[in-house]
């Protein structure tokens, strides 16, 4: 009657395995991805090889992607801080206009070129200050050679208004313009510098980087030329400190020792990229010599050693740290003295001291420790309005000494060494709008007119 039905199947796979066969040499090496030179195929090849045909919707999506990629090669697009002209050329509109107490209102036109894999990088800047009535320019070029881009040659020619002990541009320069306009606070000091520099760096192996450099610069004092401001028209900007006018020719040597292990991606087109597999700290050693024998006004030597690292353990322990020391001998001009890495109020993102005044401590010997830990969402994770933010705690310590000879040599004496070891602690809220960070820092000693300091910066990534 069909109430009972029996069925069954038998399946057998017979394979021929060879156990413990020796693996050919070169299969497991430091290259984790290797694209063969003839691996690039056109759409006709893949159309003939497809086992499952794409749907019309998928084909349309692929065509749209190809159109978008081709469009990017020639279109003009605007991003948050830059204009893009095609794939390789950019310009920064935030630097087209800026203001400071030396140049007054200033214009700066700039263009940047980056080739694929940044093998070639070129930058051009031309500007003019309406208060100091001086033109400025800076042309730089660098090229990376060899298959893994481990040999780099760089050169720059410049005539510019240089910021003392800090480099800024883009968002930082725009931010300084706003604080000058509305709070009469020009955060940095300036001097004129005209000359050129070039450098060569080479990695014989991933763990060692060698470098040599040469700088020639004629450096002169820049004077304050304006007191204009929107909100405080009856007040005055602080004086721009004089420097030791000098002609400097400086030879530099540097060495990086990096114990980390690396793997590589071979793109098959003559380019190789490195990927770090470990997170050990690395050591940077530097030496600078400015001899009178080759025309320098002042003769001095500077030595530098810095250990840096970043270690992620878990969501609560994400450490970044720097330990370093600098030592100088000879007659060091004011503009070349050692200093602590600190943000003078330019919304910068570098790791360093938070509660210091700009150029407060200078000297010919310095020692510093910077440590911070990102606790992630641990503090604010359950707070509705704050759960997207990170909490960062930091501690910084440092000591700067200045010899009597170099203090007397300095053209400006509005600075000092630290009284013992300077200490500060604090915390910050990061990932504000994904890119900003607010810090609250407290001095534990060397207290002058303030113990607490709040600053607004770009986040560290």
Where does each model-flagged region fall?
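C-terminal outer-membrane beta-barrel translocator/porin domains of Gram-negative envelope proteins
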Residues: 153-170, 179-189, 270, 275-383
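Transmembrane beta-strand segments that form the barrel wall of outer-membrane beta-barrel proteins
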Residues: 88-99, 110, 115-141, 153-155, ...
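Residues on the lipid-exposed face of transmembrane beta-strands in outer-membrane beta-barrel proteins
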Residues: 107-113, 139-143, 155, 196-202, ...
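Residues that define the transmembrane beta-barrel architecture of outer-membrane proteins
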Residues: 103-107, 133-137, 192-196, 245-251, ...
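Gly/Pro-enriched, hydrophobic low-complexity segments
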Residues: 1-29
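Short loop/turn motifs that connect adjacent beta-strands in outer-membrane beta-barrel proteins
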Residues: 26, 78-81, 85-88, 114-121, ...
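Transmembrane beta-barrel strands of outer-membrane/channel proteins
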Residues: 113, 122-128, 153-161, 212-218, ...
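Outer membrane beta-barrel transmembrane domains
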Residues: 227, 232-247, 334-432
């Amino acid at each position: 009657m069909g109430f009972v039905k029996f069925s069954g199947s038998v399946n057998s796979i017979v394979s021929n395995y060879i156990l413990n066969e020796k693996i050919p040499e070169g299969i497991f090496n430091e290259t984790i991805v290797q694209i063969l030179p003839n691996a690039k195929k056109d759409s006709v090849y893949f159309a003939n090889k497809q086992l499952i045909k794409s749907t019309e919707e998928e084909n349309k999506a692929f065509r749209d992607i190809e159109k978008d990629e081709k469009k990017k090669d020639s279109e003009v697009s605007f991003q948050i801080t830059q204009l893009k002209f095609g794939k390789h050329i950019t310009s920064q509109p935030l630097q087209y206009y800026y203001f400071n107490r030396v140049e007054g209102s200033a214009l700066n036109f700039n263009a940047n070129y980056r080739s694929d894999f940044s093998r070639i990088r070129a930058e051009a800047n031309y500007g003019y200050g309406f208060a100091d009535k001086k033109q400025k320019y800076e042309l730089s070029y660098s090229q990376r050679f060899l298959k893994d881009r481990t040999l780099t040659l760089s050169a720059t020619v410049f005539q510019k208004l240089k910021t003392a002990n800090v480099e800024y541009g883009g968002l930082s320069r725009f931010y300084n313009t706003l604080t000058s306009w509305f709070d009469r606070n020009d955060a940095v000091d300036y001097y004129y510098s005209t000359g050129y520099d070039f450098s060569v760096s080479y990695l014989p192996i991933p763990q060692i980087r060698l470098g040599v450099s040469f700088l020639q610069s004629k450096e002169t004092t820049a004077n304050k030329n304006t007191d204009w401001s929107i909100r405080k028209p009856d007040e005055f900007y602080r004086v721009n400190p004089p420097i030791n006018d000098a002609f400097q020719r400086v030879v530099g040597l540097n060495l990086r020792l990096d114990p980390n292990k690396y793997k590589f991606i071979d793109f098959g087109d003559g380019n190789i990229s490195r990927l770090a597999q470990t997170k050990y700290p690395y050591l940077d050693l530097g030496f600078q010599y400015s001899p009178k024998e080759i025309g320098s006004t002042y003769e001095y030597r500077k030595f530098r050693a810095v250990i840096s690292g970043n270690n992620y353990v878990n969501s609560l322990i994400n450490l970044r740290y720097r330990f370093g020391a600098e030592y100088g001998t000879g007659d060091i001009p004011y503009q070349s003295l050692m200093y602590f890495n600190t943000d003078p109020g330019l919304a910068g993102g570098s790791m360093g001291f938070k509660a210091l005044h700009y150029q407060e401590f200078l000297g010919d010997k310095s020692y510093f420790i910077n440590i911070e830990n990102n606790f992630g969402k641990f503090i604010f994770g359950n707070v509705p309005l704050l759960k997207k933010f990170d909490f960062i705690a930091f501690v910084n310590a440092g000591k700067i000494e200045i010899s009597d000879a170099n203090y007397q040599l300095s053209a400006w004496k509005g600075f000092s060494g630290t009284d013992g070891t300077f200490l500060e602690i604090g915390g910050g809220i990061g990932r504000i709008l994904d890119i900003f960070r607010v810090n609250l820092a407290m001095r534990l000693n060397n207290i002058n007119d303030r113990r607490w300091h709040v600053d607004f910066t770009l986040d560290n990534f």
